Amino acid sequence: SPAAEPAVQTVADSVSVTRGSGDAASDAGQADEEAGLNVKEIVLGHIGDAYEWHMGSIGGHELSFSLPVIVRSPSSGWHCFSSKHLHGGAEHEGLRIATEGEHAGKIVERQADGSDLRPLDLSITKVVAGLLINSLIVVLIVLGVARCYRGRKADSPAPRGFVGLFESLVESLVDDIIAPCVGAGYRRFAPYLLTVFFFIFVNNLMGLIPFFPGGANVTGNIAVTLVLAVATFLAVNLFGTRHYWKDIFWSDVPTWLKVPIPIVPFIELVGIFTKPFALMIRLFANMMAGHAVILILTCVIFVTAEAGAAVNSSMTAVSVLLTIFMNCLELLVAYLQAYVFTMLSAVFIGLAQEHGEPADGETVSGKDETR
């Protein structure tokens, strides 16, 4: 129908692969040679967000995946179109991507007085697309492993291969982190903590893959780590026991530290927010720094190109070796950051729980003796 044509066209535009012209690529390359390699722009361009997914270049043509733009302007209403209409600083439906100012790299709308207005932006950016893809991978892995366990009997041999590895990883997380840190009621929080671990781990690994569908710096985006930290914040405080809140507002300290000036309650109240803040910054900073270091080491090859063949050759060898080392280190960091975030979340949740008598079939540490 005619009414459906704009929507169909938008979807078609969104999934199309755009290709830059040869002349434009040549001009851009010439400009880069004259201005020198902009390492800062390369690094920030990778670790930042974008309205397209750049895949590389073939034969002088830039290949990128245009993502859908979905914004709502207070003056002109909703807009939905492909980001390819905004390439090269172009303006579409009164919208453009700002190149400077406080909204640099974001979609803005030009007002009648010449100022830029930032509309409500619900666009599917590179980070959002990577987040959706990686989340789908986590779901498929969990469903695939769960399917292997359906119909298994108690006397069946232990699973092997990927399923066996997955089971060992889950058991180690539950027995070594979740149960000891949370306590007797660990089963209540185990699904959330396991989900957080595998979500962060898969996103970290996918971020190290240099080509589509990897390469999106999801956990290096502070908005993503903020949501994860808020989720832990809610799990801690919404399910905290009355003893947890009593220790915050009326802890077992001398009375003069609580009244007339509530020194200790104020410190404890601030601690409620500093814990998730530490979770957010730790994950964000570590993942962003790892990506930045790898990119900078790679750029050393091109930065030293003008210093002569001897210098460039030696620095290229050093850069390649250090880059390989950093990539291997990032594989370890990808696991460690997921592990640390899960462990600290379990510790914070455990501190908010009442550790009384263990439940039937459980030890004081929280482990189920019947397993």
Protein language model features and the residues they cover:
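Perimembrane topogenic segments of multi-pass inner/organellar membrane proteins
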Residues: 1-160
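Cytosolic juxtamembrane amphipathic/interface segments immediately preceding
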Residues: 117-120, 171-186
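Membrane-embedded alpha-helical core segments of multi-pass
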Residues: 137, 141, 170-174, 194, ...
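Juxtamembrane interface elements at the cytosolic ends of transmembrane helices
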Residues: 140-178, 240-247, 356-360
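Alpha-helical transmembrane segments and their helix-start/interface "positive-inside/aromatic belt" motifs
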Residues: 123, 127, 187-192, 220-222
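Membrane-interface helix termini and inter-helical loops of multi-pass transporters
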Residues: 211-215
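Hydrophobic alpha-helical transmembrane segments and adjacent short intramembrane/lumenal linkers
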Residues: 194-198, 202-209, 219, 223-227, ...
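Membrane-interfacial loop-to-helix junctions in multi-pass inner-membrane proteins
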Residues: 157-161, 181-191
